[in-house]
Amino acid sequence: MLPATLLRXSGLGRVVRQARAYXEAAAAPXSAAGPGXMSFTFASPTQVFFNGANVRQVDVPTQTGAFGILASHVPTLQVL
């Protein structure tokens, strides 16, 4: 475990608290979409392509390749 002064000085304490919140959210009961499924909405400023579709995984192309998003997975930030 890291010393508390290091966590405060480097801002890592905030990151650790956020990670704990994500872990607790992932452990929460599954939504109405069913186990292993999630509600998916995809829209542009002018058009809705999917609205509340029940899906198991969303594959997303990025500038560096592609990745899959699963229900209750850790949050990520990527340029699309």
Swiss-Prot record:
Biological processes per GO annotation: aerobic respiration; mitochondrial proton-transporting ATP synthase complex assembly
Assigned GO CC terms: mitochondrial inner membrane; proton-transporting ATP synthase complex
Compartment(s): Mitochondrion; Mitochondrion inner membrane
Entry keywords, A to Z: ATP synthesis, CF(1), Hydrogen ion transport, Ion transport, Membrane, Mitochondrion, Mitochondrion inner membrane, Transit peptide, Transport
InterPro entries membership: ATP_synth_F1_dsu/esu (IPR001469), ATP_synth_F1_dsu/esu_N (IPR020546), ATPsynth_dsu/esu_N (IPR036771)
Molecular function GO terms recorded: proton-transporting ATP synthase activity, rotational mechanism; structural molecule activity
Transit peptide feature, positions: 1-22
Known function: Subunit delta, of the mitochondrial membrane ATP synthase complex (F(1)F(0) ATP synthase or Complex V) that produces ATP from ADP in the presence of a proton gradient across the membrane which is generated by electron transport complexes of the respiratory chain. ATP synthase complex consist of a soluble F(1) head domain - the catalytic core - and a membrane F(1) domain - the membrane proton channel. These two domains are linked by a central stalk rotating inside the F(1) region and a stationary peripheral stalk.
PANTHER family: ATP SYNTHASE DELTA/EPSILON CHAIN, ATP SYNTHASE SUBUNIT DELTA, MITOCHONDRIAL
Family: Belongs to the ATPase epsilon chain family.
Subunit structure: Component of the ATP synthase complex composed at least of ATP5F1A/subunit alpha, ATP5F1B/subunit beta, ATP5MC1/subunit c (homooctomer), MT-ATP6/subunit a, MT-ATP8/subunit 8, ATP5ME/subunit e, ATP5MF/subunit f, ATP5MG/subunit g, ATP5MK/subunit k, ATP5MJ/subunit j, ATP5F1C/subunit gamma, ATP5F1D/subunit delta, ATP5F1E/subunit epsilon, ATP5PF/subunit F6, ATP5PB/subunit b, ATP5PD/subunit d, ATP5PO/subunit OSCP.
UniProt protein name: ATP synthase F(1) complex subunit delta, mitochondrial
Species, as recorded: Sus scrofa (Pig)
Chain's gene name: ATP5F1D
